[in-house]
Amino acid sequence: MRTNYCGQLNSSHVGQEVTLCGWVNRRRDLGGLIFIDMRDREGLVQVFFDPDRQDAFKLASELRNEFCIQLTGVVRARPESQINKDMATGEVEIFANALTIVNRSEALPLDSNQTNTEEARLKYRYLDLRRPEMAQRLKTRARITSFVRRFMDEHGFLDIETPMLTKATPEGARDYLVPSRVHKGKFYALPQSPQLFKQLLMMSGFDRYYQIVKCFRDEDLRADRQPEFTQIDVETSFMTAPQVREVMEKLVRELWLDVKGVDLGDFPIMTFAEAMRRFGSDKPDLRNPLELVDVADLVKNIDFKVFSGPANDAKGRVAAIRVPGGAQLSRKQIDEYGKFIEIYGAKGLAYIKLNERAKGLEGVQSPVAKFLNADMLSALLDRTAAQDGDILFFGADSAKVVTDALGALRLKLGRDLSLTKDDSWEPLWVVDFPMFEEDGEGGLAAMHHPFTAPRDMLPSELAANPVSAIANAYDMVINGYEVGGGSVRIHNGDMQQTVFSILGITEQEQREKFGFLLDALKYGTPPHAGLAFGLDRLVMLLTGTDNIRDVIAFPKTTAAACLMTEAPSFANPASLEELAIAVVVKGKAAQDGKSENE
């Protein structure tokens, strides 16, 4: 039906007759002449209708935005004065000879001339995706997946599919369950990741595996999370953690060079402990120059219990953030930052404004100045490298509260005061995570997942002191986003059972949930390691949006609903009966639909 795409026409096509298919993006009547901007997935081109071409001109007078059309015409160069440098096709236009209206459009529920609500955009997603910026994001996504497949193929990885209908295993989030019609009362689970299957593939001898795969997690959503998401899943045998990181870093560096024309350079490696200490986050945004500085040793003897209490507590922390030029902040702004960190459990935000260091205590403004002596103030200013015109913000509480609160405050200050370099890329690897963390109920939970191997420990040593264990795990972080995470896996049955026991999984539960894995570990399992990238998050970064829904064709809302198809919906009673399922509903919203299931 067509010979060319609209957005690919240029001066090399001048004089050629072309047939185009697409939509009317805009129509203009100029004193008896009709112009339209015609759009397809590749972009826009201007079309001119001459009154002398009566049939085409008459039809053109009927055109409205979003009519689907086909036209034939000749490409001609625009006069020098009419070249549009803002359009890729701005040097040419089409002189239309023939026009066909393929399909007319009703008045649109979305307004292209204003910002539409996200609810409207999701409800009419098929119209929203016609917008050039949305089309470009999905084209970039396709470019990324094609690039990844080529890279993985060139490096000897095999693309192997794993099951979508599988067994529920504890991986941190709730599973989406699928009832079995054949096996009454039993359920499949949609995979949260292909973790165990890719490990089994290593045990099968496939050596290098990858897959671009859908994963499902029934968890609370954020702007960068969806109930169904896509991973670039990777696993290798006989490769160490540094070797895995080397290949995956090469993939990402070459991807950024291909898509953005940016060389990311070598990725620095930072331990979890350093990241938390300096930045208050295990995914630090290194574009932001602010850092947390420990000062507990300097205020242990201060006559101010808010500081001295945590400073003398083994589980406490006192830290400061120096904000260059922050002495200009008003009391109202400072109070707002104090309220902000209350979200993270902080009880207040102490500060010191440094107006003129040469004046000592007389040169600062601070509600805690009366508790300081000259030597203590000087030590704090030296430790934080404070300069005249700066402000120091302090956190003093448990180590967790201070780290979380100041880590979040650091990011907010970076945004509010334009300290974060938005036009730069700062990747790194974060390594040496704790193997376990407290689960809030007196037990331990795996910080990554229960199949991660510890570093340099025997099963007996791990069982004796699990809290001290360091996981052989690694996360790739870019601009404060965790884009990928992985680890060396456990390839020893005794070690795997030890980890299960530490997590409170009984031997009976181990056999019921992981018997197939424990059996497989008996038969010459190779050492193996891997990683998974969040494809949606990678595309989000590479397209410059901060919302993952912008890079998924048909995403869900933060309530895990599809406004376009109205999923999820109540099931047909006959289907439920066939599955031998009775639905018990709770709450008014569910009660309103209960009759549909009875």
From Swiss-Prot:
GO CC annotations on file: cytoplasm
Region annotation Aspartate: where it falls in the sequence: 195-198
Residue sites binding L-aspartate per the record: E171, R217, H448, R489
GO aspect biological process, one term: aspartyl-tRNA aminoacylation
Domain of life of the organism encoding this protein: Bacteria
InterPro entries named among the record's database cross-references: Aa-tRNA-synt_II, aa-tRNA-synth_II, aa-tRNA-synth_II/BPL/LPL, Asp-tRNA-ligase_1, Asp-tRNA-ligase_1_N, Asp/Asn-tRNA-synth_IIb, AspRS_core, GAD-like_sf
CDD domains the record matches: AspRS_core, EcAspRS_like_N
Binding partners and assembly: Homodimer.
Name of the molecule in the record: Aspartate--tRNA ligase
Gene source species: Pectobacterium carotovorum subsp. carotovorum (strain PC1)
Classification of source organism: Bacteria, Pseudomonadati, Pseudomonadota, Gammaproteobacteria, Enterobacterales
Gene name per UniProt: aspS
